[in-house]
């Protein structure tokens, strides 16, 4: 039985590996949206340097047909709201499996507050917990800024998530990346309560880029959802904020990444390699980020299927052990039943002997009763014969 099980598992494993290897025989397609007011600043540099994927530009309404064949979708700081149909199309595409959606936001400075609202509507419609905070992240510390409090130098410090290859994001990165006038990331639970991802996490959350020694600015209403300026504002000390975060949907092997500023198209995108004298690892970070997404899309299905196979083998092994135990239990029950049957047979034989013995005894008793009855009849007869006859008085007188 063990040999058969190993053979079956081997065949299934080979089939899974072949399927997964062929599932992305074509290059990964990255689509960049420019149809919702996004700028294309630095996009040509990004596309020119990252050549291991196919690039596609979207300038029209987003529909299922437009997203057909797309593996990674970049929405770089859109300023025009997405329609309900577009949100549904993006959601259906994302949860079809093996997809990555990148959404970049803004701070609440100037028109950025409108972008925050529009993106949060998109995120809620898609079904992710991630949200943009309604505020700005600033610092007065010259070690984490590029000569202005709003030119934030942020740090690539991804969470180590086993099996999700997050180490790729930081490979070779030793310098900060620029986030010009950024917002930060928070998350919202099913009851509508907002949470601080620095202190509270949830299954599937991956924190990627951080701001340190910073504070919250509040430029336009409403006030920030999580980071009250009275606690996190200027003069309240140095604080940490999550600037890039992702939510991973393990059942679909899909990922959504939300950022407080964009890789491309904003005032000075994350691709920047230097800014106001600050040396940056922006290009390497962007390349690593896309490399991570490609790895997740192409290798994730194999990992997931191997995990499913391992679970199936464990379940099968458990079932076989249970069946073996049941067979052993049934064997013991059968042996006990055979013993009970033999015991009953012995009891029947004993009862039969007893009955036979009783039958002989009954026959003897019947003979004795008959003899006794005959003797009684004889005695009565003798007594009757011995009785004397009476003399007639009338005859004497005559």
Regions found by a protein language model. Name each.
Residues 341, 348, 382-383, 393:
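General helical secondary-structure elements
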Residues 1-3, 358-360:
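Short, Lys/Arg-rich N-terminal segment immediately upstream of the first membrane anchor
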Residues 21-358:
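Short, surface-exposed patches at the edges or C-terminal ends of soluble domains, predominantly
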Residues 389-398:
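Cytoplasmic C-terminal tails of single-pass
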């Amino acid at each position: 039985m063990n040999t058969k099980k190993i053979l079956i598992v081997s065949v299934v494993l080979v089939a899974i590996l072949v399927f997964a290897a062929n599932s992305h025989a074509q290059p990964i397609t990255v689509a960049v949206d420019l149809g919702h007011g996004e700028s294309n600043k630095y996009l040509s540099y990004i596309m020119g340097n990252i050549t291991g994927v196919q690039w596609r530009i979207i300038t029209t309404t987003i529909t299922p047909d437009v997203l057909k064949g797309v593996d990674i979708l970049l929405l770089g700081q859109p300023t025009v709201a997405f329609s309900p149909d577009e949100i549904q199309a993006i959601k259906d595409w994302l949860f079809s499996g093996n997809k990555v959606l990148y959404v970049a936001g803004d701070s609440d400075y100037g028109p950025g507050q409108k972008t925050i609202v529009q993106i949060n509507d998109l995120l809620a419609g898609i079904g992710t917990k991630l949200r943009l905070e309604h505020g700005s992240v600033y610092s007065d510390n010259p070690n984490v800024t590029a000569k202005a409090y709003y030119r934030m130098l942020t740090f690539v410090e991804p969470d180590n998530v086993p099996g999700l290859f997050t180490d790729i994001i930081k490979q070779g990165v030793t310098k900060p990346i620029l986030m010009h006038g950024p917002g930060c990331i928070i998350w919202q639970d099913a009851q509508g309560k907002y949470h601080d991802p620095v202190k509270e996490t949830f299954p599937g959350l991956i924190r990627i880029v951080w701001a340190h020694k910073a504070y919250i600015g509040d430029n336009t209403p409403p006030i920030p959802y999580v980071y009250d300026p009275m606690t996190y504002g200027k003069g309240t000390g140095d604080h940490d904020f999550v600037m890039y975060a992702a939510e991973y949907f393990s059942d679909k092997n899909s990922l959504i990444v939300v950022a407080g500023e964009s890789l491309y198209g904003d005032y000075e995108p994350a691709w920047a390699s230097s800014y106001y004298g600050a040396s940056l690892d922006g290009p390497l970070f962007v390349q690593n980020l896309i490399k991570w997404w490609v790895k997740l899309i192409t290798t994730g299905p194999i990992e997931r299927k191997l995990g499913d196979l391992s679970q199936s083998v464990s379940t099968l092994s458990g079932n076989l052990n249970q069946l073996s135990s049941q067979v052993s239990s049934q064997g013991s029950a059968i042996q006990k039943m055979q013993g009970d049957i033999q015991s009953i047979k012995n009891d029947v034989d004993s009862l039969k002997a007893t009955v036979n013995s009783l039958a002989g005894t009954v026959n003897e008793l019947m003979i004795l009763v008959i003899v006794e009855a005959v003797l009684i009849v004889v005695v009565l007869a003798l007594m009757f014969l011995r009785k004397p006859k009476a003399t007639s008085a009338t005859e004497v007188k005559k």
